[in-house]
Amino acid sequence: MALIPSLGTSLSGMKTAQSQLSIISSNVANVDTEGYTRKIAQQKNVILAGYSQGVSIGEVTRKVNEGLLKSYLAANSLNGNLAAQNSYLSKTEILLGTPEGENSVSANVAALQTAFDSFASDVTSSAGRYNLLNQADTLTSRMNYISEEIQKLRGDADMNIAADVDEINKLLDTLDNLNDQIVKYTLLGYDGTADLLDQRDQALRSLSEKMDITYFKRDNGEIVVQTTNGITLLDNDPHYLSHNAVAQASPTTTYAAGGIDGIYVNGEDITASIKDGSIKGLIEVRDVILPSLQSQLDELAGALKAQINSVHNQGTAYPNTPSELTGTRTFIDPDKQQIKIAEGDVRFVIFDTNGKQVATTSLKGGIGFDSGSISEMAQEIQDWLRSADGPNLPQAEVGVDKNGKLFINTGDSNYTFSIIDEAGSAAGTAQQLSLIHISEPTRHAQIS
């Protein structure tokens, strides 16, 4: 009769060995499976009536270093952040082109400079004039295109933030469901939680790629997930994120000004609290990197405009001078807005129908105006135009129109005028007309 218990003991040993081999085989087969961890089957002695009746498989445990896992989550968040930024930096690199590329801004600026040099050698050349206008149009079109694309990229980044928020909410649902299963199996003493724990760790990895997180475990096997700033994302139930993507971005559409929606949890805006992950990278792209690029582009455009206008205003109209001009700058309150001519001067020359000079003066040296309001300056110029010591044009008018634009009109089409900047002794002082934005329309180099 002792043979049967002995056979039972041997059989249990064989079954236990078979189970262990199955687990080892699974470990080998899944060595390259993402999220899979090594499983270890614990053997336990079977006691019946005080006697050993063989062995059986006990709890199947995982070989996991929890500290290493948390370090991985932090590194994964940083990687998600940098990957998101790199994706958009690659797009902007393509947009801007290489310095030596034909469509780059630097190449367009160089082409405009060449066109200016060529036209300066023969200002009567129609071909040179056309080429100059064409190169200026190419440059401005290119800069406008880049500006539009920058704003599209900002809008795309915000849409990707919304997509990441949706993905995070799905991952929180997954973690919540796995929590429930793990807690249930743990309380009932069922085996089989190891694979569920693997799935939960994999969900944590995916979540950490989107934003910076940390977690802690409760005795029942449940985990609580928070941001690294302590904002709860999962505690018994998910705390969902929300974000409404902007329909269309523009340079004035910003998160700081309220034009772009924040990222909310339980009604609290956590945008500034997100420290890492792809969402942080996208926020950086949308609110810092691309706006900085836009600012640099605007600065370049402003510098080009100021420099070209400054040089342009040192010349005169060709071939015909005008009898009236209207500026491009808008003055909101010309009675209070001030202008000061620190260096250099502005010369006014009046011509008759034969192109003969009939009168000339300068704003500072002749008229005697070096500082004051826009209205005061306009009155001084008008007084000179009407005076007997000047061109004696009683119908002449100088002022600010209903649109806030400064205008000069001789009041007699038989008399035209030219305005020329005169540089002072200091470098870079021939810029007075740029201050009031008066320019002659037949000067083809004008950018306004």
Map each language-model feature to its residues.
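Structural signature of extracellular appendage/secretion-system components
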Residues: 1-439, 443, 448
